Each structure stands twice: as C-alpha cells, then as structure tokens.
Amino acid sequence: MPQMAPLNWAMMTIMFSLSLLVSMIILYSNFNSTPPTKMKMKTSQKLIWKW
C-alpha cells in the first residue's frame, strides 16, 4: 500500500514533535521552578493551556 506510507510518516512526525514539545515544557517548568510542587503543577498546567 504505497498510498498509506506518507500518511503514516506524517502521523509519526506529528506525534514526535508533540512529545518533544511536551518534554520541553516539562523541562522548562522544572528549570524555572524554585517554589514547591503545587506551584509547579499550576505553572505547568498554565503553560499547557497557553500552548
């Protein structure tokens, strides 16, 4: 099925970029948070909603 190959590749790329974005957000919130975990959760949620 040659027609399905580009679609699968696009889906894989999209999923990879999404996971990369999520991991970057998590890393960013981890590096930027000196307050306790509750605040960290709040900020990460805010970041996710912003995206």
Swiss-Prot record:
Summary of subunit composition and partner proteins: F-type ATPases have 2 components, CF(1) - the catalytic core - and CF(0) - the membrane proton channel.
Record carries keyword Transmembrane: yes
Record lineage: Eukaryota, Metazoa, Ecdysozoa, Arthropoda, Chelicerata
Transmembrane segments: 7-27
Biological role: Mitochondrial membrane ATP synthase (F(1)F(0) ATP synthase or Complex V) produces ATP from ADP in the presence of a proton gradient across the membrane which is generated by electron transport complexes of the respiratory chain. F-type ATPases consist of two structural domains, F(1) - containing the extramembraneous catalytic core and F(0) - containing the membrane proton channel, linked together by a central stalk and a peripheral stalk. During catalysis, ATP synthesis in the catalytic domain of F(1) is coupled via a rotary mechanism of the central stalk subunits to proton translocation.
Keyword Lipid metabolism: no
Listed GO CC annotations: mitochondrial membrane; proton-transporting ATP synthase complex
Main location: mitochondrion
Source organism, top-level taxon: Eukaryota
Protein name, as recorded: ATP synthase protein 8
InterPro entries xrefs: ATP8_metazoa
Keywords: ATP synthesis, CF(0), Hydrogen ion transport, Ion transport, Membrane, Mitochondrion, Transmembrane, Transmembrane helix, Transport
Any single GO BP term: proton motive force-driven ATP synthesis
Gene transcribed to yield this protein: MT-ATP8
Any one GO MF annotation of this record: proton transmembrane transporter activity
UniProt-annotated location(s): Mitochondrion membrane
Similarity annotation: Belongs to the ATPase protein 8 family.
Membrane topology: Single-pass membrane protein
